[in-house]
Amino acid sequence: MCTAATYKTKDFYFGRTLDYEFSYGDDVTVTPRNYVFDFRHEGKLESHYAIVGMAHVADGYPLYYDAVNEKGLGMAGLNFVGNAKYQEVSEGRENVAQFEFIPWILAQCGSVAQAREYLGRMNLVGTTFNEHFPAAQLHWLIADKEEAVTVECTASGLQVYDNPVGVLTNNPPFELQMFMLNNYCLLYTSDA
């Protein structure tokens, strides 16, 4: 099961596992500041933060699984099959296709606080990359050294949850993942 996790000491760490038996042709991918993102519904973005992460590059476009930008903001998409439901394009909102979501946030936001502002005016849509790449059903962890949030787009709309543990797995929905932590409340660490 894929898992994204944060770890804080005097430094901040962000990472994820990608538990597949085969490769989709993914590779470590760097998107420099001057790479032009051509968003399907929002046009071109020519100046942005640099991004590094794991992606499959198709037609010159990085389809990120997870990444971190130069400001230390990290983001990972994990399977959410059967629960993800994207919206239709809506006038007056910033319409972002699910495959553009990671670069949309990481290119423009330097913190989770700033990402929350972008999420407040964003509409996550199911526009496909092409006929070979249907919209992936995902939910996301966004984190920096201060906080983490989980983003889910369901039939109820776009939900942003505070994520106090800084961890996200594939299904089930985030609220159920948090509830299931009760199964482990008797575990503790000690110096003994």
Regions found by a protein language model. Give the residues of each.
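Active-site nucleophilic cysteine motif
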Residues: 2, 133-134
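Conserved small/polar residues in nucleotide/adenosyl-binding loops
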Residues: 188-192
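A contiguous strand-loop segment
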Residues: 1-94, 121, 126
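Secretory/export targeting leaders with adjacent low-complexity proregions
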Residues: 117-133, 139-141
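Extended amphipathic alpha-helical segments with heptad-repeat/coiled-coil character used for oligomerization
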Residues: 134-179
